Amino acid sequence: AAGLAAVLFDMDGTLIDSEKVWDHSLVEVLRWLGGTDLSPAARRETLGGNLPSSLAIVFREAGVEQEPELAEKAARLLVEKTAELFEEGLPWRPGALDALRTVRAAGIPVALVTNTGRYLTDKALVGIGAEHFDVTVCGDEVPRGKPAPDPYLRAAGLLGVPVADCVAVEDSPTGIRAAETAGAAVLAVPCEVAISQGPGRVVLDSLVGLRVEDLAAVLVRVREDSRA
């Protein structure tokens, strides 16, 4: 695959169908705070977000002041609930496992780049398989999580490849912004919200039947767009 240095996969909503798990946990915390349910707009806001940003949305929705002690308890509850659900096993997104295997078989470096913290990511990796990845970068291991470019820049740095020669596979506007800001080409595979075509990305319905040639073509197309 000419020019393709690495493939950087997001986790939640891209490889595994875990956005619903997060949603369930966030609603539990919201109810613990005295709220009832997340509004559709708030749900969209939490997609691809990290723990602090999602918690802030839950507190806002509950109409409760985010005092340090209460916020700490809420964060613990959110992690505990999510960990329980992660341990039950997470379903793969369509075509995701085959896509990972295809890239690995071609000898192309692979990174997992997620806004989820290390503790929960390691729980998810029990089911996903850590062996699929050369490196994993978590939201609590960088100064700023997505939508900031830090996670993608760190992943490319750990792999020792230029980020501009990488394709990031993402499902959320938050993650896409992070990857595009970092300078990676983006293959967007929408999960919970629609993603529009744009100059820095190619949008596909799913990862089913994905070939290395398709990923290389994403890189070529994005480079052409940037020169246009």
Per-segment meaning from a language model:
Residues L15, W92, V110-V113, R144, ...:
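Conserved SAM-binding loop
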Residues R43-R44, L85-E88, V110, E141, ...:
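Generic anion/oxyanion-binding catalytic loop in active/binding sites
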Residues D37-L38, Q66, V110, H132, ...:
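Residue-level detector of short coil/turn "hinge" positions at structural boundaries
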